[in-house]
């Protein structure tokens, strides 16, 4: 039993809790700095040439699961250890402190009062009357008062002892919610052009919600830079009912546990007409060699497919740059403008943007929100000082002894006692 007690004392020590919090904070920082959930090849390409912190290459990174820090075995172990430490601390330290604060202690001798942190002695002509005044004054100031055989015990702020317990409970719930969300949550990133949709599966791998992009709009500043982008999406239930919602950057849609973010934008296709052909919707792809936000495609201008040109564009507003196969810029075509290019009449009908949507389903979010609320309440309660006052009298000496304790702000309590004395003197 002695060894078990020693282990529990070590486990619930403040030093261990601080060390665990420090390790978890460092782990979260690593998870922020290192891209998560990428392919193994991504880490080999990026971290073998430039190791993280100069020493952690791709092999070490993958071995210790830094590619998915928040679901790694060692990170979950740290969370479980911290949760266990907080639980043991609450049961072995905080609950007994709360229980002690709720118990009434009956001090019967002046010597006990004199040993308290704050103590005063009052000479009075009428002890019974003075005790009654003190009792009424304490009640008036919000103290909980108990009188036993002419002895007064009073306490205030006992609820403050509940604060640390609530903080521990909130932190445990926070870790449970975050872990549950990491293990069971889902994240989907998808670019959709207007009219396209994505089907989501429920927990039984059956078709659930359908997210359809109805309209996508990019707002640009006078220099042509994207300032805001908005999507109007239809959320379609399996039974066919649907709701139309608008989302934009910093204004996501929350729907039955699903959060839909407006995360990015792109260009999906160019609608073009060559000579007398029907309107052709040609997909375009990013061309990183030409710039960070440049999309393009190669098309032939005649039926044999040999006379090719490169179309590039960096905005849904145009223009479309047309290059020869040797890289020479032939022309720039605006939307709904047509021009002869290498013997073919080319007309740009429109440029179709696509909306970058980020879908997140995190079942741990309600528990995380609840935990934050509990932590805030616990933190607020922890500020409250728990104060206790005892009052005794000796009729033979016409003396009243008053003393008190406080877990914090002892100077505040030492100022209250003179006020009580002043009240009696008046």
UniProtKB/Swiss-Prot annotation:
The chain crosses the membrane at residues 14-34, 72-92, 162-182. Its main location: membrane. Keywords: Cytochrome c-type biogenesis, Membrane, Thylakoid, Transmembrane, Transmembrane helix. It is a multi-pass membrane protein. It comes from Prochlorococcus marinus (strain NATL1A). Required during biogenesis of c-type cytochromes (cytochrome c6 and cytochrome f) at the step of heme attachment. This is Cytochrome c biogenesis protein CcsB. GO terms for biological process: cytochrome complex assembly. It is found in: Cellular thylakoid membrane. One of its GO terms (cellular component) is plasma membrane-derived thylakoid membrane. Coiled coil: none annotated. May interact with CcsA. Belongs to the Ccs1/CcsB family.
